[in-house]
Amino acid sequence: MPTHRHRHDIVVVGARAAGAATAQLLARLGYDVVLVDRAVFPADTVSTHQIARTGVVQLHRWGLLEAVLDSGAPAIRQVTFTVEGQSTTRAVKDKAGVDLLVAPRRYILDTLVAETAAAAGADLRLGVTITGVHLNDAGRATGVYGHDAAGAPVEIDARFVLGADGLRSRVARAVGAEIIEDRGDRGATQYAYYAGIPWDGIELIIADRALTGVFPTHDNQACIWICSPSTDARAARRRAASREDAFTASLDRAAPELARRLRAGRRTSPVTGMLRSPNVIRRAHGPGWALVGDAGCHRDPITGHGLSDAYRDAELLAVALDEALRGAAEEGSALAGYQQQRDEAVRDIFDLTCALADYPPAAEFVDLQKRLSAAIDAEAATLAAASVPDRREPAPA
């Protein structure tokens, strides 16, 4: 027998960055929210997990930043840029109410935000795989179906279905959310974790056809990553005996001084990542459904803004759904407003991402990085000035 046939306000498919953040905001607003994920937390995912200032602002506004720091993620207070062998170190300035950056491991961060959603009242169901979306005769999403970890069928009815299930979103496919912009998948990102070496802060190393970085994280380790054209990464794989050998060879070429330092420490994880990173924007809403996070917009990790995008868009969507559910705005108008706000917010950084993923000469790359920093600071200021959605009385039926 199918279970869970009570009609909820919202079911959120995907309990990581975008989904958990959206669910915790909607639960704070008093809605009956079900949050599901096929993983059982704590569980890791592919991510280099540095949170840009915009995302740190969101965590601070929602009251979660201290919990992230208390989890053992180090407060990052300086960034070192290296271009053509010349290094410059800059302090993280106090802007938009925050004076630090952070790069928590995803199995810790995602668990923390999902548990915050549950504490706010969301019904968190882990180990549940959603395989499809129920649509009525008019084409409106009315719920989702799938199975639990034991294979038992699960059906969840809801007034709204939110797809926060990542780049290869099943929700997006099920509702036919079309891609409205596709800028290709020419970039690759690979990373591994290293320990036994002191880390002073974030490091960004610009080289010919590569950007390499260091993100200090939990347990005195750092995420060491390299972004490069997909063609280069694939060629390195073909030349090497293993993924790890290819990664080491790429570091030797793009960041030799960092590679030398890494030999004094130890690698604590396999090398992982993506050899193709799509730059796509999907339609973000339709009758009874909406997409958030990578399900709606994904771009090359070279700008390190994916988590920040997810947290920004989670709030935009929560506000729009609140307006629709309490009748303050017509549903189509509210969700169209969400998509417009998302598209406007992502535009500059999306374009800069695509430009950086072309790996122009160093001087142009540095100029693009400066423009990226200005865009992030402007967005952070806008977010810091906004009111946090929070209304705990029951939502109207």
What is each model feature region?
Residues V13, A27-S47:
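Glycine-rich FAD pyrophosphate-binding loop
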Residues T116-E257:
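Predominantly flavin-linked oxidoreductase catalytic cores and closely associated redox partners
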Residues V319-A397:
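C-terminal helical "tail/cap" subdomain of flavin- and related membrane-associated enzymes
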Residues K95-E115, A192, R237-A241:
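Short beta-strand to alpha-helix junction loop
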Residues R238-A320, A324-G332:
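FAD/FMN-dependent oxidoreductases across multiple families
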Residues P2-A18:
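Beta1/beta-strand and adjacent pyrophosphate-binding region of the FAD-binding site
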Residues S87-P104, G143-Y145, C227-S230:
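Helix-loop-beta segment of a Rossmann-like dinucleotide-binding subdomain
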Residues V46-T80:
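N-terminal FAD cofactor-binding segment of flavoenzymes
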